Amino acid sequence: MALHFTQVTIVGVGLIGGSLGMILRRKGLATRVVGVGRRVENLKAAVELGAIDRYVVDPKEGVRDADLVVLATPVDTYDRHLTEWASCLKKGAIVTDVGSVKGLLVEQAERAMPAGVHFVGAHPIAGKEKTGVAAGSDQLFMGARCIITPTKTTDPQALEQVRTMWQETGSVVLTMDAHLHDKILGAVSHLPHVAAFALINALAEIRDQQIPSLDL
């Protein structure tokens, strides 16, 4: 499907959020990309690096006109963020995230959505030794796995838009139950990043082959 958003708002413009913004802008997938954060110097750097078009420090202002909101802050801040600005989202908006923990957080996020607003959980498995928007790259997600965690109530059109967005980043998109995601990621969390990523890729390939004995 052809993908284009009038406004994408990224809440938390660090390595992941900044890299996503760079891709959205380079590929023309959004008319404007707005960054939301608390540190103005970081947001100014994000503009200079091409990660966002403009920034605001008031999240309510930042999300009000957004077609898509990407929550790219630490997962332990999700509840605070959604409580603060979810009611400001326009009808038809989509909210997604990039967090490494799903499960209950996905359920909480869905409950926080106003009528007509849709949440789709996502976890791009990509990173670098360095963090922050200065380490961002429009190649960060190329060839990486991105796990999307829909539920029974996920809006199909919103799901497809989020899936397509991550495919546009060069990611290989995998769909998985949120709680199963947490079990698998928890099992590999003690491994070095390279080994963990390799194991996730192997599990994804097994799933893609649709082997009946493995419910992945």
Regions found by a protein language model. Name each.
Residues 42, 77, 102-105:
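Conserved short alpha-helix immediately C-terminal to the canonical SAM/SAH-binding motif I
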Residues 1-65:
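NAD(P)+-binding Rossmann beta1-loop-alpha1 motif at the extreme N-terminus of oxidoreductases
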